């Protein structure tokens, strides 16, 4: 396989820019180390529970948003209906 010669844009400079943003620090509740008393299975169970809690919270938030959106649509519909009745009287 032949490699093509590098042009000036592809030559690495001394000030390199990372391709990905720096990783945020791992939250303490998601950290696992073999030296801890917690077994790997217990860690996975705990992480699964946390993910379930987050999924339920997102689902609940989505349902509340949907109910609020339905109420807004119903109120606007009623308001426009009342305005139409008032204008056509």
Curated annotation (Swiss-Prot):
Regions that span the bilayer: 67-87
Coiled-coil regions listed: none
Stretches for region Disordered: 1-21
Protein name: Envelope protein US9
UniProt-listed Pfam families: Herpes_US9 (PF06072)
Modified residues (Phosphoserine): 33, 35
Alphabetical UniProt keywords: Host cell membrane, Host endoplasmic reticulum, Host Golgi apparatus, Host membrane, Membrane, Phosphoprotein, Signal-anchor, Transmembrane, Transmembrane helix, Viral envelope protein, Virion
Processing after translation: Phosphorylated on serines within the acidic cluster, possibly by host CK2. Phosphorylation determines whether endocytosed viral US9 traffics to the trans-Golgi network or recycles to the cell membrane.
Annotated motif Internalization motif, positions: 20-23
Gene Ontology biological-process annotations: intracellular transport of virus
Entry's family note: Belongs to the alphaherpesvirinae envelope protein US9 family.
Residues on Intravirion side: 1-66
GO-annotated cellular components: host cell; host cell Golgi membrane; host cell plasma membrane; host cell smooth endoplasmic reticulum membrane; membrane; viral envelope; virion membrane
Virion surface domain ranges by topology: 88-89
Primary role: Essential for the anterograde spread of the infection throughout the host nervous system. Together with the gE/gI heterodimer, US9 is involved in the sorting and transport of viral structural components toward axon tips.
Comp. bias intervals (Basic and acidic residues): 1-10
Stretches for region Acidic: 29-38
Membrane topology, record value: Single-pass type II membrane protein
Localization, UniProt: Virion membrane; Host Golgi apparatus membrane; Host smooth endoplasmic reticulum membrane; Host cell membrane
């Amino acid at each position: 396989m032949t490699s093509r010669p590098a042009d000036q844009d592809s030559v690495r400079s001394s000030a390199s820019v990372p391709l990905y943003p720096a990783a945020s620090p791992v939250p303490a509740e998601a950290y696992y180390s073999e030296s801890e008393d917690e077994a790997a299975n217990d860690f996975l169970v705990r992480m699964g529970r946390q993910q379930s809690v987050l999924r339920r919270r997102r689902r609940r938030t989505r349902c509340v948003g949907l109910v609020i959106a339905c109420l807004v649509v119903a109120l606007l519909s009623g308001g426009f209906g009342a305005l139409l009745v008032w204008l056509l009287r």
